[in-house]
């Protein structure tokens, strides 16, 4: 076990027998998720409220000039309504937009910090998510990193999860002024809270920084992530949320940029990245199951997206895809955010043939499929 000397957060020791700990956690994960996958029957959903990273950011970083984790410029948004870049890290809608549409709430979930946000949008939900965010505070401080030959160029991040909660508190006060305290409490209680985060912690912070690997092993770092995710879910519960879904991390070792950087000459999926992700997901599911039992509230749910996306990657033709190892933007090998722009990168003519839009984020079609899979299992 490597000792923790970096000032990120205290990490509880992991067992000296990794095999049996992982085996136990897998069993606990299966028990917890099987018991908690469904939302309560006959519940209406007035709003969807989202926290997390670039997977569900809809433009909260647009005016933050200290980060490159923003995409409010073409070709981002090329397939969104009107072909306008919104700040979504995608060619069109993201998964939470499709989920909101399927619930019949609204066609898409706007960014809370959108200057054109209408008061009525607050009643049906917003996203506080920010590109570059992570469960480990240090992740958001790093946020975006560009591999420009050598060395790495590190830049300040977006909105940390702790700050996203501050924005949520501001949102609640606005709601109270609009509809009163009692209705605000009812909306929060019945709304669906979705937390989608963790990819940046694994790729950018742990595997991107040798100094972090020297002070944490995979077991202790994933424990840190899962413990912080549990704390975040508990905070939402304290705010009055009673329908909370915390999403696991996707198979980050298979996204195009990570294949390019660590997948070897043949750009294979990076096994050690995916193994770390799976270990984190198991711990996250176990933590959420434990939290639900502690609170006596069975509406805190772990949502798996690892298998959903991996199934698409491993069997793309089943879903109508042709390209899984490159993004649609530019060469598809490394372009993301600033490197994916109309001046330096061409866009593939048929986005629906690509699983990934840029080198890190899926296409609108992929998100649509994953939203459908989500509904089949969790709603």
Swiss-Prot record:
Cross-referenced CDD domains, in alphabetical order?
SGNH_plant_lipase_like
- Where does the UniProt entry place glycosylation sites? 42
Q: Which UniProt keywords apply?
A: Glycoprotein, Hydrolase, Lipid degradation, Lipid metabolism, Secreted, Signal
Gene3D superfamilies recorded: SGNH hydrolase
Please state where this protein is localized. Secreted
Q: Name one GO biological process term.
A: lipid catabolic process
In the UniProt record, the signal sequence range is 1-35
* UniProt-recorded name of the protein: GDSL esterase/lipase EXL2
């Amino acid at each position: 076990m490597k000792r923790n000397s970096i000032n990120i957060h205290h990490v509880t020791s992991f067992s000296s027998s990794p095999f049996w700990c992982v085996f136990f956690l897998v069993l606990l994960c299966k028990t917890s998720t099987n018991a908690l996958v469904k939302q309560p029957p006959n519940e209406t959903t007035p709003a969807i409220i989202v926290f997390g990273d670039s997977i569900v950011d809809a433009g909260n970083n647009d005016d933050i000039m200290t980060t490159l984790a923003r995409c409010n410029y073409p070709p981002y948004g090329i397939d969104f309504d009107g072909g306008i870049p919104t700040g979504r890290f995608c060619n069109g809608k993201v998964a939470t937009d499709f989920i909101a549409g399927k619930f019949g709430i609204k066609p898409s979930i706007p960014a809370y910090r959108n200057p054109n946000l209408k008061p009525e949008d607050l009643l049906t939900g917003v996203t506080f998510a920010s590109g570059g965010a992570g469960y480990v505070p240090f992740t958001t401080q790093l946020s975006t990193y560009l591999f420009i030959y050598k060395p790495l160029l590190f830049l300040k991040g977006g909105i940390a999860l702790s700050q996203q909660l501050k924005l949520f508190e501001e949102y609640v006060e606005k709601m109270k002024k609009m509809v009163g305290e009692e209705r605000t409490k009812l909306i929060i209680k019945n709304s669906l809270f979705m937390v989608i985060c963790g990819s940046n912690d694994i790729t950018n912070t742990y595997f991107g920084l040798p100094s972090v690997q020297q002070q944490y092993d995979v077991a202790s770092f994933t424990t840190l992530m899962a413990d912080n995710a549990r704390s975040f879910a508990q905070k939402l519960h304290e705010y009055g949320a009673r329908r909370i879904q915390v999403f696991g991390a996707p198979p980050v070792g298979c996204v195009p940029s990570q294949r390019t950087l660590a997948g070897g000459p043949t750009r294979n999926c990076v096994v050690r990245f995916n193994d770390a992700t799976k270990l984190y997901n198991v711990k996250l599911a176990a933590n959420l199951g434990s939290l639900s039992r502690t609170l006596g509230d069975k509406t805190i749910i772990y949502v798996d997206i690892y298998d959903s996306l991996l199934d698409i990657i491993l069997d793309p033709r089943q879903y109508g895809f042709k390209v899984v190892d490159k993004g649609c933007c530019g060469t598809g090998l490394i372009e993301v955010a600033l490197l994916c722009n109309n001046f330096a990168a061409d866009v593939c003519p048929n986005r629906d043939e690509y699983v990934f839009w840029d080198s890190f984020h899926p296409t609108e079609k992929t998100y649509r499929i994953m939203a459908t899979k989500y509904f089949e299992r969790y709603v």
